[in-house]
Amino acid sequence: MTTTLQQRESASLWEQFCQWVTSTNNRIYVGWFGTLMIPTLLTATTCFIIAFIAAPPVDIDGIREPVAGSLLYGNNIISGAVVPSSNAIGLHFYPIWEAASLDEWLYNGGPYQLVVFQFLIGIFCYMGRQWELSYRLGMRPWICVAYSAPVSARTAVFLIYPIGQGSFSDGMPLGISGTFNFMIVFQAEHNILMHPFHMLGVAGVFGGSLFSAMHGSLVTSSLVRETTEVESQNYGYKFGQEEETYNIVAAHGYFGRLIFQYASFNNSRSLHFFLGAWPVIGIWFTAMGVSTMAFNLNGFNFNQSILDSQGRVIGTWADVLNRANIGFEVMHERNAHNFPLDLASGEQAPVALTAPAING
């Protein structure tokens, strides 16, 4: 008997690279989206850390009054931020090579654009990588669909809103207090609290938290005991076991009696789809709300107060909200504007055009 051995041709470096990138046997899956995700997220993270620590003040309003955001210029972890690029730059793409010098690039807030653009590309690729890994493993694509909710929210805040407002200086600062400042100014200029899409987003986030807590507590309370009373119930679960780890019938019966029968799911698959869909849809609506308000399609306003038959104002919550918004707007960009538009567009006050004659 004769055995013939044929030497296998060695794969090229490109083929080896392709096999490594798409292999699901790696400890961490890379994927084709990962080849772009890894460098962009590393770039964004590195630039953010350096800018947060040591970036010089930025002329955010374009009026030659720089605002310091880094730690070395007097801020702490709470007040520090990567300050958005200058209003003098507007929506222009502002990479390092567009500036006359590195100092000019830093003064005009170039690091903000670098971090934001690299970060957005990175999270887009992360979402694509989730789909890619699901496809390789034969899974359904709902993981990347769920992740599209925070991706759409970040895109609305960092890209769509500055485009609608005409300048990246209106983007959200990359810091804790900068985030809150952005929220307050957004309320002042767009009345987001009175926008129905924001209300749906609040229902999605808080409702999702409630449903998650309810589900986790119900499951934990109806675990099937596989251990003695002196051992933790967690030891009764073996990874990959075929048996149910909790009694869904008991959980269904408890919740159905606690509220009413049809408030409880009797199908585990529909239950978990609901738990995933509720917050995702809510955050989608919030992202759509921010994207529409970016072009000044704002929340409901009740600027006309309710008057009685004598013409006196009947105070309502809308009046309180309007005064708060005007107060926020007065504090915002106080050196760039004299008055917010709500105050500047009121009735004109009579002024003296000629000086009175003084006879001494």
Swiss-Prot record:
Annotated Fe cation binding sites: H215, H272
Record-annotated site: Tyrosine radical intermediate: Y161
Gene3D superfamilies per record: Photosystem II protein D1-like
Compartments where located: Cellular thylakoid membrane
Its EC number(s): 1.10.3.9
UniProt keyword list: Calcium, Chlorophyll, Chromophore, Electron transport, Herbicide resistance, Iron, Magnesium, Manganese, Membrane, Metal-binding, Oxidoreductase, Photosynthesis, Photosystem II, Thylakoid, Transmembrane, Transmembrane helix, Transport
GO terms of molecular function: chlorophyll binding; electron transporter, transferring electrons within the cyclic electron transport pathway of photosynthesis activity; iron ion binding; oxidoreductase activity, acting on diphenols and related substances as donors, oxygen as acceptor; oxygen evolving activity
UniProt-listed PROSITE patterns: REACTION_CENTER
Post-translational modification: Tyr-161 forms a radical intermediate that is referred to as redox-active TyrZ, YZ or Y-Z. C-terminally processed by CtpA; processing is essential to allow assembly of the oxygen-evolving complex and thus photosynthetic growth.
Phenotype upon changing N266D: IoxIIA; herbicide resistance
NCBIfam families reported in the protein's UniProt record: psbA
Family of the protein in this entry: Belongs to the reaction center PufL/M/PsbA/D family.
Quaternary organization: PSII is composed of 1 copy each of membrane proteins PsbA, PsbB, PsbC, PsbD, PsbE, PsbF, PsbH, PsbI, PsbJ, PsbK, PsbL, PsbM, PsbT, PsbX, PsbY, PsbZ, Psb30/Ycf12, peripheral proteins PsbO, CyanoQ (PsbQ), PsbU, PsbV and a large number of cofactors. It forms dimeric complexes.
Name of the protein this chain belongs to: Photosystem II protein D1
Gene that encodes it: psbA
